[in-house]
Regions:
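Amphipathic alpha-helical segments used for helix-helix packing
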Residues: 100-126, 176-181
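Solvent-exposed, amphipathic alpha-helical segments
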Residues: 23-30, 73-81, 160, 164-171, ...
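C-terminal peripheral helix-coil segments that are non-catalytic and often amphipathic
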Residues: 141, 145, 149, 167-213
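Alpha-helical structural segments
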Residues: 15, 19-26, 44, 61-81, ...
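Helix-turn-helix
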Residues: 19, 27, 33-61, 65
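Amphipathic alpha-helical packing segments from all-alpha helical-bundle domains
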Residues: 119-147, 196-199
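N-terminal intrinsically disordered/low-complexity leader segments
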Residues: 1-15
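Hydrophobic alpha-helical connector segments
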Residues: 65, 79-106, 154-161
Length: 213
């Protein structure tokens, strides 16, 4: 059995939580939602399964914090990309598309969001939603400052982007079985990657936008 030494400082607590989250990430990317268990996490960390309960009540809370980590990185990338250069509609869509393609794992995790939220304590959900609100406020402020667009058009853009959050990964990562079934059923399907899908859809969502500069 691993010896457990309780973290005594905020920094130590944060380090332990990050170690748990990183182990969860490795397990999830290799085996999906069902593969993530406290037992599996303990096998990849420096402490035992029971000690994980000192930091998280459920595996979903670990996954919720992993999604928060992904989302913060994604948002930082969006802000960094849009902080300089021209503000044309094309570049706006391209930056979001390129940053999103660099964070595909976030969109994979979004496919399990309902399960994750159902199994998480509300404080973990609130922490994630706070960053989500930050994104909404930032992107709305950017659109207001740089584009002539009606309120309806801006709302349509946000709604479309939310759909991409949940649907882009499954659409761009069909299994061999899914692809074979589509072909056998005669369903037209043109394989694409996440960046291309994002850019194509975002250009449609912003078709009525006009640059102020």
């Amino acid at each position: 059995m691993k010896d457990f030494v309780r973290a005594s400082t905020e920094e130590q607590i944060a380090d332990r939580r990050e170690e748990i989250i990183s182990a969860c990430e490795e397990i999830y990317l290799a085996g999906g939602y069902d593969a993530v268990t406290f037992k599996a996490i303990s096998e990849k960390t420096s402490f035992s399964r029971p000690s994980i309960y000192n930091y998280f009540d459920t595996k979903e809370e670990v996954m919720m914090d992993l999604l928060t980590r992904y989302f913060v990185g994604w948002l930082d990338g969006i802000k960094g990309g849009l902080s300089s250069g021209d503000v044309s509609r094309e570049r706006f869509c391209r930056i979001i598309s390129e940053v999103s393609a660099e964070h595909e794992n976030m969109f994979l995790l979004f496919t399990d969001l309902k399960l994750i939220e159902d199994g998480s304590g509300i404080s973990h959900i609130i922490a994630f939603k706070g960053h989500f609100r930050e994104f909404i406020e930032y992107i709305c402020g950017f659109m207001d400052a740089n584009f002539h667009a009606s309120e309806q058009s801006r709302e349509g853009f946000l709604e479309g982007l939310m759909m991409l959050f949940y649907g882009s990964y499954p659409h761009t990562h069909l299994s061999d079985k899914q692809t074979a079934a589509m072909e056998a059923a005669g369903v037209p399907y043109a394989p694409t990657d996440l960046r291309t899908l994002f850019y194509r859809q975002l250009m449609l969502f912003t078709s009525s936008f006009r640059s102020m500069r």
